Regions:
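C-terminal ends and interior cores of transmembrane alpha-helices
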Residues: 13, 33-47, 110
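Juxtamembrane intracellular "pre-TM" segments in multi-pass secondary transporters
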Residues: 137-169
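Hydrophobic core of transmembrane alpha-helices in multi-pass small-molecule transporters
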Residues: 38-39, 49-66
Length: 180
């Protein structure tokens, strides 16, 4: 299933190209709606292999759209000269939230006799809905500034780069070996 989870990341190039005229805020909102659909599919559909893979793909498309927009929005809404700090804060709070979520899942599945997958997917869908409605509060209309560089590689952002590498490596290890 790792292939099907990562396939939307590759498709993201084409998705973003097709919707290049939309603002980062609008794309982030679209990603939230797609993520909610995918998580809702996990919660409501029977757990057959094909439907589970379809739900993973739908959720992952939304997640990849949001991943692409998080940095853009963090930089856009940051105070002047504080873009790196904003990205670092956003990334670290994301990491902490993910870690807390993993610990809750581990504790629940250790303490409970039956494995309440449907309940957790339902709860995740509710949280995705809350997140989606929060994202609808974004009102800005970002536009690409053609006078600025597209990629930033600066020494002062080293911590941010390391956090992103840690996030990707941790996620790959967990998704590869977590089911076993």
């Amino acid at each position: 299933t790792e292939f099907f989870r990562e396939l939307p990341g590759i498709a993201l190039i084409f998705i973003l190209a097709a919707f290049y005229m939309l603002s980062a805020e609008t794309m982030f909102k679209i990603g939230a709606v797609i993520m909610l659909c995918g998580m809702g599919m996990h919660a409501l559909l029977p757990p057959t292999k094909v439907l589970a893979i379809l739900a993973i793909c739908v959720y992952s498309i939304g997640e990849h759209i949001q991943l692409a927009m998080k940095s853009t929005l963090s930089l856009q809404y940051a105070r002047e000269g504080r873009g790196g700090a904003a990205q670092g804060f956003q990334s670290s709070t994301n990491q902490i939230g993910t870690l807390i979520g993993y610990l809750i899942i581990i504790a629940a599945f250790t303490l409970l006799d039956n494995q309440p997958y449907t309940m957790f997917f339902g709860l995740a869908a509710v949280l995705a809905a809350v997140s989606m409605f929060c994202s609808f509060k974004l009102v800005g209309k970002s536009e690409t500034d053609s006078t600025k560089r597209r990629f930033y590689f600066h020494k002062k952002y080293t911590k941010y780069y390391m956090l992103e590498m840690f996030y990707g490596a941790r996620k790959q290890v967990f998704l590869t070996f977590g089911p076993y």
